[in-house]
């Protein structure tokens, strides 16, 4: 019941913040140059066809009821799609509504995000502390693109509360171009800290839970997005010969959300290095993934076994924030067979 209360509180608040953040991000001028993609509905007749679309294109939405994926498609591939037998419907109005490049000024960059985190630590030293849990790829391999960043988290809670409290772990921005998610993570942390002692829900959460917030799990990628590119992945450019500057269809890096050790290389990931869903050369090949897995493992004792439901009293909750699809997803992503907990 406690977990359900936490989830309900969070989802309602999150929905409001995502709407506000997305609305703020939408307040940008109509572009003067054509966008680098065409928005189109790509229709599919099977799960295999959908997977091929996901692997080869930047899918923004999947409408299972009508059997299409809304995708950003490179203009020079539209004819080849149609020749291959794919039903394609181009949406010119929506295509022209998106900018060819640029970074919305309403979103903070990595430097701003780090400064806001530091401000919270300074303002509420009894309730929040920073934790360094690793390094970004560029931090270990600096080059002309930059020197990289330390990976940081905020740990929130009443220091006087008993040890062994359940964990609420919130992670944002593993996909760099999903710019609303770090803003939402910061807003969530700020609301808990500002509300402690006056707001019943915020006080209850910080008194009874450990709350860990990662504002950006992919700072290198975020910095690329700040330059106006549709970067999704991290900054590892050692595999493949990819487009530079990056495009939404062709970019260097590894999709950190496809690089985790568990069930690596299965449904929903790509083996092509320049694909936006490239999974990396091996499970947890990326330093960001390794750091995150070690950090989480140090906070949560795994009680999971394949094919066996989680114990009913499992208290911890991990949420990964994304600004794509308007979905609430739960494990597993590598199979269509429901989890034993469903």
What are these regions (language model features)?
Residues 1-11:
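Bacterial N-terminal signal peptides that target proteins for export
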Residues 9-20:
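Bacterial N-terminal signal peptides
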Residues 23-342:
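M14 metallocarboxypeptidase catalytic domain recognition
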């Amino acid at each position: 019941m406690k977990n359900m209360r936490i989830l309900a509180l969070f989802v309602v608040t999150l929905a409001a913040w995502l709407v506000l953040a997305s609305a703020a991000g939408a307040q940008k001028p109509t572009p003067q140059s054509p966008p680098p993609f065409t928005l189109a509905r790509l229709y599919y007749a099977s799960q295999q066809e959908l997977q091929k679309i996901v692997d080869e294109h930047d899918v923004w939405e999947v409408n299972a009821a009508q059997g299409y994926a809304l995708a950003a498609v490179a203009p020079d591939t539209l004819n080849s799609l149609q020749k291959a037998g794919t039903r394609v419907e181009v949406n010119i109005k929506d295509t022209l509504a998106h900018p060819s490049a640029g970074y919305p000024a309403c979103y903070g960059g990595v430097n701003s995000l780090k400064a806001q985190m530091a401000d919270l630590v300074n303002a509420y030293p009894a309730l929040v502390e920073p934790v360094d849990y690793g390094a970004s790829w560029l931090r270990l391999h600096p080059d002309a693109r930059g020197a990289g960043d330390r990976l940081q988290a905020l740990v929130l809670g009443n220091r006087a509360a008993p040890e062994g409290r359940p964990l609420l772990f919130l992670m944002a921005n593993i996909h760099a171009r999903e710019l609303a998610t770090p803003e939402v993570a910061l807003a969530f942390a700020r609301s808990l800290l500002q509300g402690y002692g006056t707001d019943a829900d915020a006080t209850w959460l910080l008194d009874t839970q450990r709350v860990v917030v990662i504002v950006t799990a992919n700072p290198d990628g975020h910095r690329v997005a700040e330059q106006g590119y549709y970067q999704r992945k991290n900054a590892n450019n050692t595999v493949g010969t990819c487009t530079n500057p990056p495009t939404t269809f062709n970019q260097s890096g590894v999709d950190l959300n496809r690089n985790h050790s568990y069930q690596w290389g299965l449904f929903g990931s790509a083996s092509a290095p320049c694909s936006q869903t490239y999974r990396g050369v091996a499970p947890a090949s990326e330093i960001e993934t390794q750091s995150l897995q070690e950090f989480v493992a140090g906070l949560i004792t795994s009680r999971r076994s394949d094919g066996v439901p989680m114990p009913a009293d499992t208290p911890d909750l991990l949420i990964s924030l994304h600004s794509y699809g308007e979905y609430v997803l739960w494990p597993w992503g590598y199979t269509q067979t429901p989890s034993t907990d469903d």
